[in-house]
Design a protein with these regions (language model features):
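C-terminal functional extensions of proteins
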Residues: 188-238
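A short, acidic, amphipathic alpha-helical segment used as a generic capping/interface helix at domain edges
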Residues: 10-12, 60-62, 163-173, 188
Length: 238
């Protein structure tokens, strides 16, 4: 699998081309929230699901393991070092402290900000349809074949339920072939997608995060408003 090249917009077009060419791969996007978990903070997310991570939990260790993954077919999106929204050390810390492989690198915002409209356009017009692992229950006009629901407070109880929930997700995808499987399951996505790829590499696994939230949850992110600066931003690594 070749490395992605160029800015965020160019990366997205390369991802879409790979999907249309029936290539199998995965994308995970550890960003600000995952960074706080890795840095061992206790905090409550302000994302609409409002889960709480407690320091010294197992999720921190599972994330560390996941983002060091050297599977050449797994792209790992991290915050860029040019937009200035994230702490200035985050880009370097992901690469050096947490050992994200640079050959696998893409942008944490690859499906968001100025790429959101293009991502929505692609998902809505994807004729084969896709599976969605999510907490969102609202009906919407997307070709979703089926939803696999998770508890929106799963982070809170991860220490107790991670084995059974991970097994449930793996059982859900194990027999699927040549499918697009989208994950909107917060930090757990970063743990699950590498495991799914190992068990069953014959699919595309995308960490779409909050991309469909305004449709499946009724919650609005700033980048979905064309009048915000977020909706116009296109990241590039320097």
């Amino acid at each position: 699998m070749t490395s992605l090249v160029g800015n965020m917009r160019e990366h997205l077009e390369q991802i879409i081309e790979k999907i249309n060419n029936n290539e199998y791969f995965g994308v995970i996007r550890p960003s600000d929230g995952e960074f706080l978990i890795l840095e061992n903070h206790t905090f409550t997310a302000q994302t609409g699901d409002d889960w709480t991570n407690k320091s010294d939990g197992l999720l921190r260790e599972h994330l560390k393991e996941a983002i060091k993954n050297i599977n050449p077919k797994l792209y790992i999106g991290i915050p860029c070092n040019t937009c200035g929204h994230s702490p200035s050390n985050m880009y370097d810390d992901y690469l050096i402290k947490y050992q994200v492989p640079k050959t696998n690198l893409t942008y944490a915002n690859i499906f968001c900000n100025s790429n959101w409209s293009r991502t929505i356009e692609f998902l809505k017009s994807y004729e084969k349809g896709f599976f969605l692992i999510t907490t969102g229950t609202l009906e919407c006009d997307f070709p979703i074949k089926e939803r696999c629901y998770i508890d929106k407070f799963l982070v809170n109880n991860w220490n107790e339920v991670w084995e059974t929930e991970t097994e449930r997700i793996l059982n859900y995808i194990k027999d699927k072939q040549n499918e697009l499987i989208c994950f909107a399951s917060g930090p757990m996505t970063k743990v699950w997608i590498p495991k799914c790829m190992e068990l069953n590499p014959n699919n595309v696994y995308l960490d779409i995060g909050s991309v469909l939230d305004c449709y499946t949850k009724g919650t609005i992110r700033p980048y979905t408003d064309p009048n915000t600066t977020y909706s116009k931003e296109c990241c590039i690594f320097l």
